[in-house]
Amino acid sequence: MELPYISICTPTYNRNNFIPLMLSNLAKMDYPKHKLEWIIDDDGTDKFIKSPEDLKQVKKVIAPIQLKYFWYPKKRTIGVKRNNMVKKATHKIIACMDTDDMYMSTYLKRSLDKMREEGASLVGSNQMIFIYPHNNFKITAIACESKRQIHEASMLFTKKHFNAMGGFAKNSQGEGASMVDGMGGNRVALTQITDCLICIAHKGNTVDKEQFIDTEDITEQVDLSPIDIELIKDILCDEEYIKV
């Protein structure tokens, strides 16, 4: 079956040190790049794209992926930003991709496969994997019980589903629950977090990841490449607690 076009949505606020990670995530996707669109909603004081020259350079780096960049002078909640990006999206399939998560190359394809297998209109994982660069790159994991606890950064859904549910809640934590609550049957399906992403613990996390550092230790089960490790070190080099 032919793969559909997908709009990838990234909300950001003063996360420019994560630009190399964002570009790496896009580049590694095992998906036809000409079928992808990247939408950025930025309300930071340090703009992601500061000039027409910057815009031209980013477009060149991610080509043939198309880029839509929007900057707003007033800081808004993550839920508001996610809703705005969906409305700006060209395509009928939406994938969330947050700034500070390391995505697996399989994220888009495996999510789409699950959507088709289950006849779902939204898929995502209620599991989470965390990596702690400040603690010798320890990796831990948790598994939540409910579909409403699907991690927003792992969501792939249709615009039709978004419109039917009224979008994300207008807050910055747990905003994705409104995309699941009240949706019965198999319209919402669960993906494996190992096919999606790893959350990176750092000082600027929206939700403090330190609370999960003593959960299940899966360090030996996750094979991070030296390139991935060096990328994280470079991104967090200004954080005092990282062991470089």
Predicted regions and their residues:
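Cell-envelope/extracellular polymer assembly enzymes that use nucleotide-activated donors
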Residues: 4-7, 37, 178
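Acidic donor-binding loop at a coil-to-helix junction in glycosyltransferase catalytic cores
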Residues: 171-179
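A conserved acidic beta->alpha catalytic loop
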Residues: 25, 39-57
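Short aromatic/hydrophobic "clamp" motif used to bind/position activated sugar donors
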Residues: 94
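Short beta-strand/loop segment that forms part of the nucleotide-sugar
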Residues: 34-47, 68-72
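Short, acidic, metal-binding catalytic loop of nucleotide-sugar glycosyltransferases
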Residues: 24-35
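Glycine-rich, basic loop-to-helix element that forms the pyrophosphate-binding segment
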Residues: 72-89
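Conserved donor NDP-sugar-binding/catalytic core segment of glycosyltransferases
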Residues: 106-137
